[in-house]
Amino acid sequence: AIFATDDFEICTRLVQGEYYKYQNMFKELPLHTVISRKELLDAMVRAKMCTAEKCPVKFEIAGSQLGLSIKDQTTDYHETVDLQENISEELTIGFDARLVIETLKAFDCDNEGISLQSPKMPMIIEAEDSDFKTIVLPVAIK
């Protein structure tokens, strides 16, 4: 199929076969909380500014707080963000800080739901007031 306007032309083709069942990635996870998008985004930006290296951010989630930290040879940054709902289990998980920041910027809401399962499983972030949701894959932390 060809889609054309005065400014551009897009050519596409139908891919044969079954499309990946991405809905299975968004299953309900056992650990869920709600957090202020602005507070988490601001904390992530401050943490990322402290290091020039590509370092993972470590989330330490317990009770009603999310501790985030970035550590490299010259930086040891820690900050705590309050959760709006207690989380039932403690969890430590790492993420690419840049990806978390870009993901949070894509949302247009005040609060986000965060769902987790384990340090090796993705985090699901969903808008509190819409159906928009995304997955952020974890990275290994030391």
Locations of regions flagged by a protein language model:
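DNA polymerase processivity clamps
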Residues: 1-15, 28-142
